[in-house]
A protein has these predicted regions:
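Pyridoxal 5′-phosphate
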Residues: 1-99
């Protein structure tokens, strides 16, 4: 197979990613912050651990400033909405992300 849409879906996923997601789904499977039960708290801890690891990697002082979005389009749009004001103009080319 020749897969030409890697930027959209990151296929194939690295085995470690598949293993971690499978383990989370089998062992925890709860929504973080949705409740106070053990699995919900554990889900929240897992996400916070990921925030800490990314904060360390990118030299971000406060791990709570690391956010997760559904995909690159959502992340880029959120960043732009935080930077732009009404009346601002954005110039792009055909080479930019299509969000």
């Amino acid at each position: 197979m020749i897969y030409l849409d890697n930027a959209a879906t990151s296929f194939p996923k690295p085995a470690r990613v598949v293993d971690a997601m499978t383990e989370f789904a089998r062992e925890i499977g709860a929504n973080p912050g949705r409740s106070g039960h053990r699995l919900s708290v554990e889900a929240g801890r897992t996400i916070y651990d990921a925030r800490e690891a990314l904060a360390s990697l990118f030299k971000i002082r406060d791990p709570l400033r690391v956010i997760f979005t559904a995909n690159a389009t959502v992340g880029l749009n959120q960043a732009l909405l935080g930077l732009l004001s009404a009346g601002d103009r954005v110039v792009t080319s055909g080479m930019e992300h299509n969000s």
